[in-house]
């Protein structure tokens, strides 16, 4: 799996523009327009990273993040939202967000943050695989 993004944003115009920008920058983006649709996409497909708005109909981004982390605690999440109150930012991080970006934002900065998080995730994945190999060797040698 490489560079697959689940983008959940209820503003369809903004979502389409951001999807196009990320696609131009070599990401495969699935756009969902509410939290329920986002959860459905997440359970039916594999993604490397998720980007969620917070204020959405049917299921807000915080609830969606809780559901995603219950399914796969290692999936990186970025909140991209107009909600810039300290309490909201803290809640985002408490739910396991890797980053919390407030609108308006710099698209180039978002791109670099996505890449940095994906690189970190790949390193952690490699470490887990290496530990698995080591444990297999250890158990096989007994």
What do the predicted segments below correspond to?
Residues 4, 116-142:
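Short, Lys/Arg-enriched segments at the junction into DNA-binding effector domains
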């Amino acid at each position: 799996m490489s560079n697959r993004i689940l983008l959940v944003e209820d503003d369809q115009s903004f979502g389409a523009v951001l999807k196009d920008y990320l696609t131009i920058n070599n990401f495969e983006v699935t756009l969902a327009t509410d939290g329920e649709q986002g959860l459905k996409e997440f359970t039916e497909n594999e993604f490397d990273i998720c980007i969620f708005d917070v204020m959405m109909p049917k299921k807000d981004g915080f609830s969606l993040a809780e559901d995603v982390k219950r399914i796969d605690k290692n999936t990186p999440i970025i909140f991209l939202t107009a909600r810039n109150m300290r309490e909201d930012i803290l809640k985002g991080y408490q739910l396991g967000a890797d980053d919390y970006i407030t609108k308006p934002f710099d698209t180039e900065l978002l791109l670099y943050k996505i890449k940095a998080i994906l690189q970190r995730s790949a390193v952690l994945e490699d470490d887990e695989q290496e530990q698995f190999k080591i444990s297999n060797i250890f158990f096989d040698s007994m």
